[in-house]
Amino acid sequence: MLTHLARTLSRQLTGLGRSSLCWFPHPGFLYRGLSALSVTPRLLVPGRAPSLQAPAPATFPQDRGSLLGQCQHLACLQPCAGMKTKSSLKRRCKNCFYVRRRGRLFVFCKTHPRHKQRQG
């Protein structure tokens, strides 16, 4: 069960790195996720009855405010355009331009960053 939890957490963290939003999770978020992994095995020790009381949540000085205060750092996320991978590249507007770098062909657009493409 512990290996399943570790795989799930690592898959979620790698998925965050590939997402189209550029953001870094709050340090408390990562600590709570990892502390949940370390708390779970103690509850599953053989020969010990599982307690009905939930483990106390980790407290951090910056998290003591309201729920709005805890999620305040999410409001400042700035989306960044990802790169589409295509076999044939096309200019999507008059401001798109081709660039050859590292042996690949790219399309960039300063007017519409969502037009970025990479030849794959």
Swiss-Prot record:
UniProt cross-references to InterPro entries, sorted A to Z: Mitoribosomal_bL36m, Ribosomal_bL36, Ribosomal_bL36_sp
Keywords per UniProt: Mitochondrion, Ribonucleoprotein, Ribosomal protein, Transit peptide
Main location: mitochondrion
GO CC, alphabetical: mitochondrial large ribosomal subunit
GO MF term (any one): structural constituent of ribosome
Pfam families named in the record: Ribosomal_L36
Localization: Mitochondrion
GO BP annotations, alphabetical order: translation
Quaternary structure (record): Component of the mitochondrial ribosome large subunit (39S) which comprises a 16S rRNA and about 50 distinct proteins.
Family that this chain belongs to: Belongs to the bacterial ribosomal protein bL36 family.
Protein name as catalogued: Large ribosomal subunit protein bL36m
Organism for this UniProt entry: Osmerus mordax (Rainbow smelt)
